[in-house]
């Protein structure tokens, strides 16, 4: 596996002082302290669970799974994302502190997978809900591919500039036309507008009183005949 190149240190002064910038020091400290929030909804998450074992030992990368989004700086989505789960995913992402990163793992997360062909409730790409930093294709991806995706994310962190990363979130989030979603406001407050995600049904309900009022009586003789 390729090692991460971090050419930010000034090596002109030997054996005594290391000169660098605050931005480079911040990036270096975050390389080995990625705390992921595991968002698994389908079979792809089983492949990620195998990383916890001694064979792959993902602890060497400083990955410490967290159960709270407020303690995580990386969310790893694995599996199919449905319309019902979309508000929960957006809320979890908004509750994560900056800077935060997203890895989309598996075909179902990236494009909707095989469920997107005939399913009305499948979100065709998690990037329509939250910004994605690393795409990890596969059905499902191997654990080695997950390690490679984490390595690429660490390389991206090593090169980024802090002021560019702390940018305003997307003002609007556009959903696919097939889902009949609408453009919604930025959910920075954590209060997701449920009415925009679940529009009222076009069919109106008939009350019980109205149903029995206009229902014509049918005798047992007519029912038999």
Curated annotation (Swiss-Prot):
The keyword rRNA processing does not apply. Keywords: 4Fe-4S, Chloroplast, Iron, Iron-sulfur, Membrane, Metal-binding, NAD, NADP, Plastid, Plastoquinone, Quinone, Thylakoid, Translocase, Transport. Its cofactor is [4Fe-4S] cluster. Pfam families: Oxidored_q6. GO terms for biological process: aerobic respiration; electron transport coupled proton transport; photosynthesis, light reaction. InterPro entries: NADH_UbQ_OxRdtase-like_20kDa, NADH_UQ_OxRdtase_20Kd_su. NDH is composed of at least 16 different subunits, 5 of which are encoded in the nucleus. Belongs to the complex I 20 kDa subunit family. This is NAD(P)H-quinone oxidoreductase subunit K, chloroplastic. It comes from Capsella bursa-pastoris. The gene is ndhK.
């Amino acid at each position: 596996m390729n090692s991460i190149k971090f050419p930010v240190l000034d090596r002109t002064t030997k054996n005594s002082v290391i000169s660098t910038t605050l931005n480079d020091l911040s990036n270096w400290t975050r390389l080995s302290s990625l705390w992921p929030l595991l968002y698994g909804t389908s079979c792809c998450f089983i492949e990620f669970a195998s990383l916890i074992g001694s064979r792959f030992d993902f602890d060497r990368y400083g990955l410490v799974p967290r159960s709270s989004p407020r303690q995580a700086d990386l969310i790893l989505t694995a599996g199919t994302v449905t319309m019902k789960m979309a508000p929960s995913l957006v809320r979890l992402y908004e509750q994560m502190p900056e800077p935060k990163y997203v890895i989309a793992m598996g075909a179902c997360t990236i494009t909707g997978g095989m469920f997107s062909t005939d399913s009305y409730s499948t979100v065709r790409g998690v990037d329509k809900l939250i910004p994605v930093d690393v795409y990890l294709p596969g059905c499902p991806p191997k654990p080695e591919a997950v390690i490679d995706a984490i390595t690429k994310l660490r390389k991206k962190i090593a090169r980024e500039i802090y002021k560019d990363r702390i940018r305003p979130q997307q003002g609007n989030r556009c959903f696919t036309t097939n889902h009949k979603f609408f453009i919604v406001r930025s959910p920075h407050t954590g209060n997701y507008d449920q009415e925009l995600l679940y529009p009222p049904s076009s069919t109106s309900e008939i009350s019980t009183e109205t149903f029995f009022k206009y229902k014509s009586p049918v005798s047992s003789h007519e029912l038999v005949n």
